[in-house]
Amino acid sequence: MNNQTLATQYEMDFSYNPLPFFSDIEDNLKFNKKLDLNLYCIKRPKQTCFIHITNPNMLAWGIESGDMLVVEKNDDLYSGDLVVLEENNEFHVYEFMAHSGNYLFMALDSTTQNINTKRLVKFTYYRHRDQYDSSNETSR
């Protein structure tokens, strides 16, 4: 086998192949449709962005350096939401808690201070998409 043939075989073995739908596996072994996860995972694409995590200090929350957060822009804020706030041209991730008129933004970064306030200023919040699913929507 020469190098040209070996390279062609390598491309065929390791080239991108989309995952088939379960129901299509038996019917069509040569699957040619692509599955776009954005259509299924992102409800509001114009209000959604991705934030690449470079901070290694959020391991206690299961967020590692190199992870990608799916973040949705939203005007509403609920206890338990993960929110992204910009401070000094850097993004920081907090968990929002509200109790008896006190509002706490608990930093997920172990080296960042929590923010405790009695008054919320009206601004747009960026909420980590994973915390917002339709099953919790009715309980809010």
Swiss-Prot record:
Matches recorded under InterPro entries: LexA/Signal_pep-like_sf (IPR036286), Peptidase_S24_S26A/B/C (IPR015927)
A Gene Ontology biological process term: SOS response
Pfam families given in the database record: Peptidase_S24
Sequence similarity: Belongs to the peptidase S24 family.
Name this protein carries in UniProt: Uncharacterized protein HI_1546
